[in-house]
């Protein structure tokens, strides 16, 4: 189910404060966050946000096409390395 239109998009308060502070200073620096559930809003465009994937922080540059999506969508948590090869030779 999608979020009700009566509600505003969720953005963590600490993340919103950091974005607003950087926008008033007109500075660009990497913002480190663990908040994967936060929605990308238009004030975040142009910033680089390092999103935690469970192991490390991945820096993601926010563009206008990302608005409305969640931060966690751009930092995958699992690495699929492919299916196991047929190893009949090693079993003999």
Curated annotation (Swiss-Prot):
It is found in: Plastid, Chloroplast. The keyword Ribosomal protein applies. One of its GO terms (cellular component) is chloroplast. GO terms for molecular function: rRNA binding; structural constituent of ribosome. Keywords: Chloroplast, Plastid, Ribonucleoprotein, Ribosomal protein, RNA-binding, rRNA-binding. Pfam families: Ribosomal_S19 (PF00203). GO terms for biological process: translation. Protein S19 forms a complex with S13 that binds strongly to the 16S ribosomal RNA. Belongs to the universal ribosomal protein uS19 family. This is Small ribosomal subunit protein uS19c. It comes from Nicotiana tabacum. The gene is rps19.
């Amino acid at each position: 189910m999608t979020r009700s239109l009566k509600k505003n998009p969720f953005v963590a308060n600490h993340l919103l404060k950091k974005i607003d502070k950087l926008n008033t200073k007109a500075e660009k620096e990497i913002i480190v966050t663990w908040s994967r559930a936060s929605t990308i809003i238009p004030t975040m465009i142009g910033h680089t946000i390092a999103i935690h994937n469970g192991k490390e922080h991945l820096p993601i540059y926010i563009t206008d096409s990302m608005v409305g999506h969640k931060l966690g969508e751009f930092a995958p948590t699992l690495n699929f390395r492919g299916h196991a090869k047929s190893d009949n030779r090693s079993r003999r």
